[in-house]
Amino acid sequence: MLDIACGSGRHLASFAARQHAVTGVDRDTNQARLHAPSAELLCADIENNPWPLQTDGVLRTFGAVVVTNYLWRPLLETVVNSVAPGGVLLYETFAAGNEALGRPSRPDFLLQPGELLQACAGLQVVAYENGTLQDPPRVVQRIAAIRAPADHRRHPEIWRLAL
């Protein structure tokens, strides 16, 4: 599992508690290290430096990629491409309309209507929402999307569903 902009490491800790291998990327990994000591943590400024999970042009992929409350458009394609065959992307961040409720309010940090759907065009969308949440009030887009398994051509209309 990869958590991009992992912050305090709450998602890393949750997945690690369920015996998943976890990797987190953030510009400051100190809090994540406290909450998810077993995690592979990469301290990296992903907005100003090369993607740390790519070596010699080969992108490392994960069975699950999680992104919450973070948007850096130049990385959207890399985020989606980091989902391994059969893997899932869980992404939630602020969307247009949030500027009326609080921060972030700059358009650079707010998804436009349908932007996550467009970014995930190569994945099978399982769930998508664009709307308002409370406590604290905010406007978000969220998506759960699956990359087809490597053998999907045998049964292209059938997706493995598991919780």
Language-model regions: role of each:
Residues 52-64:
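A short acidic, Gly/Pro-enriched loop at the edge of an enzyme's catalytic core
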Residues 83-84:
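Helix-to-beta-strand junctions that scaffold the AdoMet/dcAdoMet cofactor pocket
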Residues 108-122:
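Short alpha-helix
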Residues 134-163:
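Core SAM-dependent methyltransferase catalytic element
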